[in-house]
From Swiss-Prot:
GO MF assignments: ATP-dependent peptidase activity; ATPase binding; identical protein binding; serine-type endopeptidase activity; serine-type peptidase activity
InterPro entries according to UniProt: ClpP, ClpP/crotonase-like_dom_sf, ClpP/TepA, ClpP_His_AS, ClpP_Ser_AS
Domain notes: The N-terminus (residues 17-34) interact with ClpA and ClpX.
EC number from the UniProt entry: 3.4.21.92
Annotated GO CC locations: cytosol; endopeptidase Clp complex; HslUV protease complex; membrane
Name of the protein: ATP-dependent Clp protease proteolytic subunit
Inducing stimuli: By heat shock. Part of the clpP-clpX operon.
Result of knocking out the encoding gene: Cells undergo an apoptotic-like death upon DNA damage characterized by membrane depolarization. Decreased persister cell formation upon antibiotic challenge probably due to increased levels of MazF toxin.
Family annotation (SUPFAM superfamilies): ClpP/crotonase
Keyword Protease: yes
Subcellular location: Cytoplasm
Result of altering residue 34 to A: No ClpA-ClpP or ClpX-ClpP complex forms
Gene behind the chain: clpP
Regulation of catalytic or functional activity: Inhibited by benzyloxycarbonyl leucyltyrosine chloromethylketone (Z-LY-CMK).
Organism annotation: Escherichia coli (strain K12)
Length: 207
């Protein structure tokens, strides 16, 4: 069951990860750029939300909590969405751990990406000026016997209801408003995302 119909076309480029060389008292150490940024409590959620990616993000959040449960974690999101169960594992971990998780949308946060964007700590959810956000209802497809199709259809409706409840909780919109707005794809600019309650403000420059 998916929260997005888009495919991730950028996975092959993940092999081209820059390395960072640091001088230490013991000599040189090399890190891939994402590991180096993890030391600064920065996590990237990019591309399709799927099980492997979700497990990596959950592991990074748990590691950073163990290192320092008082310092914020920064989750940068550029995602077209993905699998609901994978996204919910990230969502539940964000709510479970002690540090606040600040979310920042760069590029796009669509579907499950938008859901995770708005799930950040209140007052610490941001968009970059030219990013876009898209919300909609879960997508599902199943082939099989008629009875099984009916079972899966009921499950999709249950998931849709739960997602709408959580979106209403995080945005401050009424459940009825969320249900109307997610019936079809709804795209929002950064200012519109702020007005809707998906994020708290737009970041233009570092403080």
């Amino acid at each position: 069951m998916s929260y997005s119909g888009e495919r991730d076309n950028f996975a092959p480029h993940m092999a081209l990860v820059p390395m960072v060389i640091e001088q230490t008292s013991r000599g040189e150490r090399s890190f891939d750029i994402y590991s180096r940024l993890l030391k600064e409590r920065v996590i990237f959620l990019t591309g399709q939300v799927e099980d492997h990616m979700a497990n990596l993000i959950v592991a990074q959040m748990l590691f950073l909590e163990a290192e320092n449960p008082e310092k914020d974690i920064y989750l940068y999101i550029n995602s077209p969405g993905g699998v609901i169960t994978a996204g919910m594992s990230i969502y539940d971990t964000m709510q479970f751990i002690k540090p606040d998780v600040s979310t920042i949308c760069m590029g796009q946060a669509a579907s499950m990406g938008a859901f995770l964007l708005t799930a950040g700590a209140k007052g610490k959810r941001f968009c970059l000026p030219n990013s876009r956000v898209m919300i909609h209802q879960p997508l599902g497809g199943y082939q099989g016997q008629a009875t099984d199709i009916e079972i899966h259809a009921r499950e999709i409706l249950k998931v849709k209801g739960r997602m709408n409840e959580l979106m209403a909780l995080h945005t401050g919109q009424s459940l009825e408003q969320i249900e109307r707005d997610t019936e079809r794809d709804r795209f929002l600019s950064a200012p519109e995302a702020v007005e809707y309650g998906l994020v708290d403000s737009i970041l233009t420059h570092r403080n």
